[in-house]
Amino acid sequence: MTTYTKLYDFFPADMFAKILDAAENGTPKTMEHPDLPLILDVDTFKNTDIHTHIDNFFKDLGYNTENSTCRLQGTKPGAEYKIHKDTPSKVVTLLIYVKGQEGTTFYEDVHGKAHITWNEGCPKADWGINPTVDTFTPNAGYWFDRNSQPWHSYENTQDTIRWVFMYNIQDIGKYESVQLNTTSK
């Protein structure tokens, strides 16, 4: 049962080159998240042709992109995102792999707990049912909406930062996605 849509060659080559360059060389706006093992740039691509490209993709699918956010996100070596579903504020989540090796693992369901929040995660003893790994391929990735959002997790077992490009459409009135707002994960 697939609850996400796989994407290939999502960005035109010139756009992906800009994103890859930012991941490899950093930007003046790159900063570490104070509570999570993340390196974020929430501003460099905001309201750019890259942001517009993604907005247009989702507008064509019928989504209102008025409250969309995008960011370059790096996960430090050794970090583990336990099994979780995204916050209810995320109407749509898009992830495009940029640089690394570790893909995202999706699960049909989870053992043991009826509800596991992003903050709590899921202990390894309660790993999910029927795991499927989405292969890390640069400029490929996936998207899902909150009506079909899957359980998912990943670990960065490599010695370097895992870089992805994230995009969310936010629900008005709900808390924001992971950025530097430490009250929302």
Labelled PLM ranges:
Residues 1-2, 179-185:
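Short, Lys/Arg-enriched, disordered terminal segments
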Residues 1-63:
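Non-heme Fe(II)/2-oxoglutarate
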Residues 38-42, 76, 185:
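Amphipathic alpha-helical surface "interface" segments used
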Residues 46-47, 110, 182-185:
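Noncatalytic linker/hinge segments flanking ATPase motor cores
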Residues 66-68, 73-181:
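Catalytic core of non-heme Fe(II) oxygenases with the double-stranded beta-helix
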